[in-house]
Amino acid sequence: MASSTSLPAPGSRPKKPLGKMADWFRQTLLKKPKKRPNSPESTSSDASQPTSQDSPLPPSLSSVTSPSLPPTHASDSGSSRWSKDYDVCVCHSEEDLVAAQDLVSYLEGSTASLRCFLQLRDATPGGAIVSELCQALSSSHCRVLLITPGFLQDPWCKYQMLQALTEAPGAEGCTIPLLSGLSRAAYPPELRFMYYVDGRGPDGGFRQVKEAVMRYLQTLS
């Protein structure tokens, strides 16, 4: 009895099962070309570098890179120091002119650049001596009295001293006596109510005079 199973025709090729064909197409379609990997430097730079607008500098760096502003100072025009023409008026005897010039050079050459009035240098030519002195005293914040043996023997110097006290009778610190070549016993009685600068030091008391002037100028508002 002949078998019912049919054999393939001669010369025909066997066909793949449909299930295997579907799997083969699926795998082929799902395959994608591999991308070229980025270099580690470009990847890290792209991923970790934020924009300059989004990330402010750390405090330590910003304080270094930011331009520093100059310290603020009070306006020259608004300071009471500039309400007068001079910071210091130096009163001295004629024989002490060299010592007075040295003192003025020291004060004007300091970092404070103090403005000094020296009568023989700054008085108006042709002006009355008394008027020039009174004008200089009223136009100065401080008065330095260079008290020496020649100062005590000169009536004109005593007038300068009394006029300086009259200009500012209650202003503490604006009249600065500089005692040079004299003992304390020779200190004028008119000045016994205020301390003096001892000129026997190596700098002749110039530094203390400058500091006293600066202290007074700092009290001006």
From Swiss-Prot:
The keyword Cell wall biogenesis/degradation does not apply. Residues 84-213 form the TIR domain. Disulfide bonds join C89-C134, C142-C174. Phosphorylated by IRAK1 and IRAK4. Also phosphorylated by BTK. Polyubiquitinated. Polyubiquitination follows phosphorylation by BTK and leads to TIRAP degradation. Highly expressed in liver, kidney, spleen, skeletal muscle and heart. Also detected in peripheral blood leukocytes, lung, placenta, small intestine, thymus, colon and brain. It is found in: Cytoplasm; Cell membrane; Membrane. It comes from the Eukaryota. Keywords: Cell membrane, Cytoplasm, Disulfide bond, Immunity, Inflammatory response, Innate immunity, Membrane, Phosphoprotein, Ubl conjugation. GO terms for molecular function: identical protein binding; molecular adaptor activity; phosphatidylinositol-4,5-bisphosphate binding; protein kinase C binding; protein-macromolecule adaptor activity; signaling adaptor activity; Toll-like receptor 2 binding; Toll-like receptor 4 binding. (Microbial infection) The TIR domain is structurally mimicked by the TIR domain of B.melitensis protein TcpB. PANTHER family: TIRAP (PTHR22662), TOLL_INTERLEUKIN-1 RECEPTOR DOMAIN-CONTAINING ADAPTER PROTEIN (PTHR22662:SF0). Homodimer. Also forms heterodimers with MYD88. May interact with PIK3AP1. Interacts with TLR4 and IRAK2 via their respective TIR domains. Interacts with BMX and TBK1. Interacts with EIF2AK2. Does not interact with IRAK1, nor TLR9. Interacts with TLR2. Interacts with RAGE/AGER. (Microbial infection) In case of infection, interacts with B.melitensis protein TcpB (AC Q8YF53); TcpB abolishes the TLR4-TIRAP interaction and downstream signaling. This is Toll/interleukin-1 receptor domain-containing adapter protein. It comes from Homo sapiens (Human). The lineage of its organism: Eukaryota, Metazoa, Chordata, Craniata, Vertebrata.
